[in-house]
Design a protein with these regions (language model features):
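CheY-like receiver
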Residues: 124-141
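Acidic, metal-coordinating helix/loop segments flanking the phosphotransfer/catalytic sites
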Residues: 21, 35-55
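C-terminal output helix
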Residues: 115-125
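Receiver (REC) domain active-site loop signature in two-component systems and cognate sites
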Residues: 62
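Conserved acidic segment of CheY-like receiver
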Residues: 4-24, 56
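As written
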Residues: 102-108
Length: 141
């Protein structure tokens, strides 16, 4: 986990992408934000980049590769798994089945994507502060 690395945000809604960008700007975190509209674009980037991202934030319902499929592909890829990148879902679809499936794929968090920008900002602030304090095996490489 590279705490100064980019935050990968996979979100097919351009409106939600702008909301995430605005929130990170208001919170004054210096991490680069890399937006992808679907899981296949993000997976291609993660498989080819030399940069180690700080965190992956993903929606679930997206075209091509949905969030669950993306998480599964990352989790099964030994090289990507060793990067120790926290994988978090932010989704409006927080039903019991989706939450259970997410945690069966070893995600590090599942958050309801609030339609209230202040609520979403509060959640993102807490998430960022938590992960900035965490120690991961990759900290020792």
């Amino acid at each position: 986990m590279n705490k100064k690395g980019a935050i990968i945000i996979i979100e097919d809604s351009h409106v939600d992408q702008r909301i995430f960008a605005e929130i990170f700007k208001r919170l004054n975190f210096s991490n680069e934000l890399c937006f992808f509209s679907d899981g296949s674009e993000a997976l291609s980037f993660l498989n080819t980049t030399r940069k180690m991202p700080f965190m992956i934030i993903s929606d679930i319902n997206m075209p091509k590769i949905n969030g669950f499929e993306l998480r599964s592909k990352i989790h099964e890829n030994e090289e990507l798994a060793l990067k120790c990148v926290p994988f978090l879902f932010f989704s409006t679809g927080a039903d019991k089945q989706s939450v259970a499936e997410a945690y069966s794929l070893s995600v590090q968090g599942f958050f309801r994507k609030s339609m209230d920008i202040e609520g979403l900002e509060k959640t993102i602030r807490k998430v960022m502060e938590y992960w900035q304090e965490c120690i991961a095996p990759s900290d020792y490489y």
